[in-house]
């Protein structure tokens, strides 16, 4: 199950990055700060879920 979850997570992170760049211009700074907090949360979760072998791209 851990390996299966890893793939979607990576794809989701990529999607979020793309949206952040596009929406970042229109969205206020307040929203931008929220996005940064979300990104930090995702990174923490990925560190816990993703295993050293998975990190290798």
UniProtKB/Swiss-Prot annotation:
Any Pfam family: PB1-F2
Polar residues: bias regions: 1-17
The keyword Nucleotidyltransferase belongs to this UniProt entry's keyword annotation: no
BP terms from Gene Ontology: symbiont-mediated suppression of host cytoplasmic pattern recognition receptor signaling pathway via inhibition of MAVS activity
Keyword annotations from UniProtKB, A to Z: Host cytoplasm, Host nucleus
UniProt entry tagged with the keyword Translocase: no
More details: Is not encoded in all strains, and seems to be dispensable for replication.
Compositionally biased region (Basic and acidic residues): 18-34
Domain of life: Viruses
One GO CC term on file: host cell nucleus
Function according to Swiss-Prot or TrEMBL: May play an important role in promoting lung pathology in both primary viral infection and secondary bacterial infection.
Disordered: region residues: 1-36
Organism: Influenza A virus (strain A/USA:Memphis/10/1996 H1N1)
Main subcellular localisation: host cell
Name of the molecule in the record: Protein PB1-F2
InterPro entries: Flu_proapoptotic_PB1-F2
Subcellular location(s) of the protein: Host nucleus; Host cytoplasm, Host cytosol
Family to which the UniProt record says this protein belongs: Belongs to the influenza viruses PB1-F2 family.
Gene name of this polypeptide: PB1
């Amino acid at each position: 199950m851990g390996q299966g979850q890893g793939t979607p997570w990576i794809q989701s992170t990529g999607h979020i990055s793309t949206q952040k760049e596009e929406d970042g211009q229109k969205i206020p700074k307040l929203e931008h700060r929220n996005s940064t907090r979300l990104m930090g949360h995702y990174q923490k979760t990925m560190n816990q879920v993703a295993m050293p072998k998975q990190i290798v791209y």
